[in-house]
């Protein structure tokens, strides 16, 4: 009997059969599972789904509706133990990519769960929309749907609202309401893994708030990637077809990012969650607690990523014998401090978790919000530390082919030897550090983490505005009043 949780083979077969409209390097892709730009990351994604059956006790749970095994990352946690179990499944997947896959399936699985359970916000417009969110969660869970999403509009004139643009039809907008659904047209950014998933979620920004004048652009829906009129226009691939030795990360985990074009796309009503209501869009992520559960996944993933960065740093230090230098230890300590701080945020978030009014065990958002605001600001420094410590060794890095060449192989092996490793091992390590921080893939990782939840400055403003400030101001006022009451004036005679 077929199980709802899919295998890697089933994931790839779905992509083959879907034949979504995917474009890259000026050509239309016939089959993403074999195209050089996608085939390796598709196999990395397939490995994630295979892991569900390799470790079913960690990666699967019984569906509350069918009793069959479904993905643990879809679970609605109702206890702290279940919350931790979901996080452990997230980190199991994260370790398979060293945290490099920012849009592994668990990220959007958490969003779909939260909005499907806390669906009454969508009913403010029409009870149908709440029912749609609930049904979509069950559908995604029971069919193990892989998802990409798009939250932002094209960068046109950021000084103007969407409806004030010179070409106001470029951003994705509502064209027509029909008895059976809606017609939408326009462009959205930035669909990571666009074209290599089953479906796409179109949702409002998590940070930028819309005005009532932007109601035609206020949409939330989910449709298959192969819906007529949908095109994924992918950026240049950073997987250049090189070996996993030369490009150990890019050759396996290059997710890709895409512009998504909607050309008079029909969306049936049962797939619509918000239609022309900027007020609901502005409140969607916070009032459903979706941002809390998504942040829980992100912090868990970033802990794994930081563990990997620390491991690379320590191996690099050991390889070239720089471990006794004062500044080297200090830089290593910086990464250790980031790791332990992130772990502390996660522990507090999980152990202070409380059930929300829908019965979902919800992590302490104060801890997660601090972590998700801080990590984008500190990640560039972590990458910088590796670059500083690697120094010229990250520039003079031969390829594996150089070691195999009969004339120069021995020269390279001798020239590249380290304190504790031979030349071959040292270059392999340094190529990893380079791909992590300096290659096109590595530079994209730094940029991606910096803007993960949106503009860090805009996020910081929102964090400041939402922070409970009064207790701290009152603390100071009471201190000053107390100081005044016990103050004894100096005796002028002395």
Curated annotation (Swiss-Prot):
Enzyme class: oxidoreductase
UniProt-listed InterPro entries: Acyl-CoA_Oxase/DH_mid-dom_sf, AcylCo_DH-like_C, AcylCoA_DH/oxidase_NM_dom_sf, HpaB/PvcC/4-BUDH, HpaB/PvcC/4-BUDH_C, HpaB/PvcC/4-BUDH_N, HpaB_Deino-type
Molecular function GO terms recorded: 4-hydroxyphenylacetate 3-monooxygenase activity; flavin adenine dinucleotide binding; oxidoreductase activity, acting on the CH-CH group of donors
Catalytic activity: 4-hydroxyphenylacetate + FADH2 + O2 = 3,4-dihydroxyphenylacetate + FAD + H2O + H(+)
Residues at which substrate binds: 103-107, 149, 205-206
GO process annotations (BP): phenylacetate catabolic process
Pathway entry: Aromatic compound metabolism; 4-hydroxyphenylacetate degradation; pyruvate and succinate semialdehyde from 4-hydroxyphenylacetate: step 1/7
Similarity field: Belongs to the FADH(2)-utilizing monooxygenase family.
Record's protein name: 4-hydroxyphenylacetate 3-monooxygenase oxygenase component
């Amino acid at each position: 009997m077929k199980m709802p949780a899919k295998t890697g083979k089933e994931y790839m077969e779905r992509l083959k059969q879907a034949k979504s409209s995917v474009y890259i390097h000026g050509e239309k892709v016939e089959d993403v599972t074999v195209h050089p730009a996608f085939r390796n990351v598709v196999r990395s994604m397939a490995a994630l789904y295979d892991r569900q059956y390799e470790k079913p006790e960690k990666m699967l749970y019984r569906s509350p509706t069918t009793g069959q095994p479904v993905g643990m990352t879809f679970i609605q946690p109702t206890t702290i133990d279940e919350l931790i179990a979901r996080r452990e499944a997230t980190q199991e997947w994260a370790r398979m990519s060293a945290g490099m896959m920012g849009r592994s399936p668990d990220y959007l699985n958490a969003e779909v769960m939260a909005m499907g359970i806390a669906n009454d916000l969508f009913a403010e417009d029409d009870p149908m929309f709440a029912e749609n969110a609930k049904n979509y969660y069950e559908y995604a869970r029971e069919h193990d749907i892989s998802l990409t999403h798009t939250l932002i509009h094209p960068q046109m004139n950021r000084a103007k609202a969407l409806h004030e643009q010179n070409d106001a039809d470029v951003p994705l907008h509502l064209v027509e309401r029909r008895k059976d659904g809606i017609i939408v047209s326009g462009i959205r950014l930035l669909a990571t893994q666009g074209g290599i998933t089953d479906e796409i979620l179109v949702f409002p920004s998590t940070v930028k708030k819309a005005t009532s004048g932007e109601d035609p652009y206020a949409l939330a829906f989910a449709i298959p990637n192969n819906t007529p009129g949908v095109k994924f226009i992918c950026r240049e691939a950073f997987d250049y077809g090189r070996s996993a030795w030369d490009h150990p990360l890019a050759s396996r985990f290059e997710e890709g990012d895409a512009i998504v074009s909607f050309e008079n796309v029909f969306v049936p009503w049962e797939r619509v969650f918000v239609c022309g209501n900027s007020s609901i869009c502005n409140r969607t992520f916070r009032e459903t607690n979706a941002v809390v559960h998504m942040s829980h996944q992100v912090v868990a993933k970033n802990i794994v990523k930081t563990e990997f960065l620390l491991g690379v740093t320590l191996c690099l230090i050991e390889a070239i014998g720089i471990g006794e230098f004062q500044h080297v230890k200090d830089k290593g300590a910086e990464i250790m401090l980031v790791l332990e701080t992130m772990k502390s945020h996660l522990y507090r978030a999980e152990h202070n978790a409380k059930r929300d009014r829908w019965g979902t065990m919800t992590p302490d958002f104060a801890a997660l919000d601090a972590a998700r605001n801080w990590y984008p600001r500190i990640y560039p420094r972590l990458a910088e530390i590796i670059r500083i410590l690697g120094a010229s060794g990250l520039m003079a890095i031969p390829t594996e082919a150089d070691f195999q060449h009969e004339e120069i192989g021995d020269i390279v092996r001798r020239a590249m030897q380290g304190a504790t490793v031979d030349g071959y091992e040292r270059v392999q390590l340094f190529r990893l550090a380079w791909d992590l921080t300096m290659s096109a893939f590595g530079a994209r990782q730094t940029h991606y983490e910096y803007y993960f939840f949106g503009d860090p400055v805009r996020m910081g403003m929102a964090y400041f505005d939402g922070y409970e400030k009064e207790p701290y101001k009152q603390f100071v006022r009471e201190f000053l009043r107390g100081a005044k009451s016990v103050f004894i004036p100096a005796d002028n005679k002395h």
